[in-house]
């Protein structure tokens, strides 16, 4: 749960299981990642589409749209299923189910992926595998030295140029 949403016991149990594995110095297996991440993606993507529906009723907003940030597995699924999304900036580094890597092969919109190279919680090889899997002909991996909170100030400027190029082309 978040905000006014009720907590979901099964998610709390899965998060506790993940925490236990990580605190013990282990790596979560694919089954745990699937049981934790995929149900969250299944819930979050329709909610995100509902938010996008509501936002696009505002006169100052129009298609095409871009998405930025958040949980990368949600972003991959959303980019795959929602035709209104023309470009995406995604933050690499979280646990990614194999099914999401498979879905990434069908994501063909322009992508800008931010990867903090020294993020202790980052699963760098998974991030690289996911980036490689994307089906987009235009994809950029911006890998920066630094931890989770070490994103350089100019990284936002790069993302702004990316979205300007794809959402507001000149000519």
Regions found by a protein language model. Give the residues of each.
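Short beta-strand/loop motif that positions the catalytic acidic residue
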Residues: 107, 113-115
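Alpha/beta-hydrolase active-site loop
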Residues: 3-59
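Catalytic active-site module of serine/aspartate enzymes centered on a nucleophile-bearing elbow/loop
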Residues: 145-146, 151-171
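Primarily recognizes the serine-hydrolase "nucleophile elbow" in alpha/beta-hydrolase
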Residues: 46-106
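Conserved alpha/beta-hydrolase "acid-adjacent" motif
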Residues: 99, 120-126
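Acidic catalytic loop of the alpha/beta-hydrolase fold
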Residues: 117-122, 149-150
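Catalytic histidine neighborhood in serine/cysteine hydrolases
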Residues: 128, 132-150
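Short, conserved loop/helix-junction motifs that constitute active-site signature segments
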Residues: 103-108, 133-136
């Amino acid at each position: 749960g978040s905000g006014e949403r009720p907590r979901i016991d099964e998610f709390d149990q899965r998060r506790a299981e993940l925490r236990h594995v990580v605190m013990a110095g282990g790596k979560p297996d694919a089954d745990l990642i699937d049981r934790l991440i995929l149900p969250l993606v299944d819930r979050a993507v329709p909610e995100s589409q509902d938010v996008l529906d509501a936002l696009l009723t505002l006169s100052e907003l129009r298609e095409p749209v871009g998405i930025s940030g958040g949980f990368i597995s949600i972003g991959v699924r959303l980019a795959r299923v929602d035709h209104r999304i023309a470009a995406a900036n995604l933050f690499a580094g979280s646990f990614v189910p194999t099914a999401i890597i498979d879905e990434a092969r069908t994501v063909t919109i322009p992508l800008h992926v931010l990867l903090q190279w020294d993020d202790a919680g980052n699963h760098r090889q998974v991030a690289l595998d996911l980036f490689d899997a994307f089906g987009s002909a235009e994809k950029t991996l911006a890998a920066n030295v630094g931890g989770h909170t070490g994103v350089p100030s100019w990284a936002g400027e790069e993302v702004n140029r990316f979205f300007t190029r794809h959402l507001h082309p000149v000519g």
